Curated annotation (Swiss-Prot):
Biased composition (Polar residues): 105-119, 137-147
Gene Ontology terms: biological process: positive regulation of MAPK cascade
Name the UniProt record assigns to this protein: Arginine vasopressin-induced protein 1
Swiss-Prot/TrEMBL keywords: Cell cycle
Organism: Homo sapiens
PANTHER family: ARGININE VASOPRESSIN-INDUCED PROTEIN 1
Annotated InterPro entries: AVPI1, Avpi1/C8orf4_dom
Basic residues bias: start-end ranges: 121-134
Length: 147
């Protein structure tokens, strides 16, 4: 095998432009000099539910090359954006108005309907969680390395 093109085409350091010589060298581990609280804040801002745990893992294993690989695979999670007008309209579309005559005629049936809807919603949610339980995603890499 020959020499990679990137190695061949790079000029020696003494021939590099002045502004390139003054730049800081790139680091393979971007969290090398970071404090634990800085890493936690980074994960919290990205919307991670397990920010403290992930930050602790990264901080303890800062020199491990597997952590760097896991971080490359970790996708940044962004919380959903809220539009000023769309946000209020979105919530209004979920409202359900009960008919006054049905609520007055039989108040117990309205309560039963609401509780049955909550039960169906919780069943759908738990089924979705069970279905996705064993799927490996980008956030599971850090736990696989640690445990």
């Amino acid at each position: 095998m020959g020499t990679p093109a990137s190695v061949v085409s790079e000029p020696p350091p003494w021939q590099a432009p002045i502004e390139a010589r003054g730049r800081k060298q790139a680091s393979a581990n971007i969290f090398q000099d970071a404090e634990l609280l800085q890493i936690q804040a980074l994960f919290q801002r990205s919307g991670d539910q397990l920010a403290e745990e992930r930050a602790q893992i990264i901080w303890e294993c800062a020199g491990d090359h597997r952590v760097a690989e896991a971080l490359k695979r970790l996708r940044r999670k962004r919380p959903p954006r809220q539009k000023p007008l769309g946000h209020s309209l979105h919530h209004c579309s979920r409202l359900r108005i009960l008919e006054p005559h049905s609520a007055l005629a039989n108040p117990q049936s309205a309560t039963e309907t609401a509780s049955s809807e909550q039960y169906l919603h919780s069943r759908k949610k738990s089924a979705r969680i069970r279905r996705n339980w064993r799927k490996s995603g980008p956030t599971s890499y850090l736990h696989q390395i640690r445990h």
